A protein has these predicted regions:
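Long, intrinsically disordered low-complexity tandem-repeat segments
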Residues: 130-143
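Conserved P-loop/Walker A NTP-binding site and adjacent catalytic elements of P-loop NTPases
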Residues: 24-130, 150-200
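Helicase-associated low-complexity/disordered flanking segments
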Residues: 1-43, 133-136
Length: 200
C-alpha cells in the first residue's frame, strides 16, 4: 500500500519525542518521513534542494545505529559520496562511517557505509550468488563466510546487521543509461531492509 502524505502533520503525535531530537521545528514532510521510518515502512521523500530532505536519512542513521544495526547510504556519484562522508563525520563524531567509491575503501566495519549505488549493486549480486550456491546449508549459508569475505568490497552481514539503505538522488532511476542499476539494486535487497529514497 502506498500512502501519500501531503496534508499538515497532526499535532500531539506519539512521535513527538523523535521530532524533539532536533533543535529546530521540523517540516510536515520530515515528520511524516520519521513516522514511516519508526514504523518500519519504506519511504520516498521528494523535496526541493535545500529544503531538508536529508534529515529523514540522518534520523534513520541515528535510529538504527542506536539499535546496533547498520545503514548503507548510496549516492549516484563519487563526489557526492565523498561529501556525505565528510559531512556526516563532522556532524556525528560518535558514529563510525566508512566510504567505498571504487577508488577509496575505508573502515569496512563501520556503522554506516557510504558508497555509490553500483558498488551496492555488485555487493548484492555477490551476496545472492553466494546464497544460491549454498542453499543446501541454508542455516549457515552467509554467517560462516570466511576467506570469501576478503574478496568483497565491504564486510557486512546483510541478513543480521543491515537494517536500512538510503538512496540519495533516487531519480537517477529514470536515467537512460544508469537507471537499471537502481532497479537491480532495489530488486536484490532482502525484504527486511528498509529503503529511504530521497529525490529532488
Amino acid at each position: 500500500m502506498v500512502k501519500v502524505c501531503e496534508s499538515n502533520y497532526p499535532n500531539n503525535s506519539k512521535y513527538e519525542s523523535h521530532f524533539e531530537l532536533f533543535p529546530f521545528p521540523l517540516s510536515d514532510f520530515q515528520k511524516y518521513a520519521i513516522e514511516s521510518i519508526v514504523e518500519g515502512q519504506h519511504c520516498l521523500v521528494t523535496a526541493h534542494t535545500g529544503s531538508g530532505k536529508t534529515l529523514p536519512a540522518e534520523f534513520a542513521i541515528r535510529h538504527f545505529v542506536s539499535q546496533g544495526k547498520k545503514v548503507i547510504y548510496t549516492s549516484p556519484i563519487k563526489a557526492l559520496s565523498n561529501q556525505k562522508y565528510y559531512d556526516f563525520q563532522q556532524k556525528y563524531p560518535d558514529i563510525q562511517f566508512g566510504l567505498f567509491t571504487g577508488d577509496i575503501k575505508t573502515n569496512p566495519e563501520a556503522d554506516v557505509l557510504i558508497m555509490t549505488t553500483e558498488i551496492l549493486m555488485n555487493r548484492l549480486f555477490q551476496y545472492n550468488q553466494y546464497n544460491q550456491c549454498n542453499q543446501y546449508n541454508q542455516y549457515n549459508q552467509y554467517n560462516q563466510m570466511d576467506s570469501s569475505t576478503s574478496e568483497m568490497d565491504f564486510q557486512i552481514n546483510i541478513e543480521k546487521e543491515l537494517a536500512c539503505v538510503v538512496f540519495d538522488e533516487v531519480h537517477y532511476i529514470n536515467d537512460a543509461h544508469r537507471g537499471q542499476n537502481w532497479e537491480k539494486t532495489i530488486l536484490m535487497l532482502p525484504h527486511h531492509v528498509q529503503m529511504i529514497m530521497l529525490s529532488a
